Amino acid sequence: CTMILSDLGARVIKVESPNGGDDSRKFGPFIKENSAYFMSLNRGKESIALNLKNSEDKKIFLNILNKTDVLVENFKPGTLEKWGLGWKDLRDKFPKLIYASASGFGQTGPLKELPAYDMVVQGMGGLMSVTGHPQTEPTRVGTSIGDITAALFTTIGINSALYDREKTGKGMFIDVSMLDCQIAILENAIARYLSKNEIPQPMGSRHPSIAPFEAFKTKDSYIIIAAGNDKLFEKLCNALDMKAELNNEKFKTNALRCKNMDELKLIMEKKLKVLNTKDWTQKLEKDKIPCGPIFNIKDAVENPQIKARNMIINTFHKVAGDFKAAGNPIKMSSYADSLKRGDVPDLDENREKIIKEFCS
């Protein structure tokens, strides 16, 4: 959340525990004993270490809040309240403050006091139940989607609250639950359950409601083909020399193609296995059929399209040195999308500067 806000121009002061700082400082991989994981998410921020149970440090924190637009916290609900720093404690002192809380289960409900990590909410939110293949053990999504979606929704909430404050002059409290965010992104799966009482199952790469829309074997690997409507299916049949299938009643509509997708996939893969993925991608792209290879991380990062979009940026840490990280996908016409981003702070690196500015 705060990385996105920093990329969009916000000044971000990261308040960390004096006892080792943010947990992610200890997560690998490491560059000269510094976490590349932490550094990639905290470029361009400032760091101050405060023990919020300590009266002097708490006073510093309140002085910072006096000149702050937004407070973002992700403690277990009730933690900051114990220290006299909850929303109800602060809203009268700082009436313009936007106070954003992101937690595992939110500030209300029977589970509100429980701790959570990304994988816990992936499991409880239903996402893992539709990920992977049938008859395999539960599969985690390959990235921390529970953390990421909560960060994105919190960022949207903060920007909405800032806009509202322009009209009302008042701050507000934002409550985002990681579990809620998993429910919010279930799209087709939750629509199927709520409308038809069907419990969706994992389907590998196949889309449950659009066909053909999955990964197919080629001569050397796999290709993603996403023929999302009848016109695209017609183009695909022509490109694959499948004119008989175009007129086959089993494949006349999207609903019928979904019903008979196993049969259609066998036919398509017989055609696709004569060429490699690169050749098929070039051929189908000429026909404007949505398709693409399945890249590993190296291939994805080295993709000229990614480089052209400044999606791999440069930053710096005084011990680790220069290193690269993922960039900002939000491109705005009024702001430069620089390849060079702000430095990564050591724990408590900016203490003197921050205290001088906010406490003098």
Per-segment meaning from a language model:
Residues A211-D287, C291:
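Aromatic-enriched alpha-helical interface/lid elements that frame and gate functional surfaces
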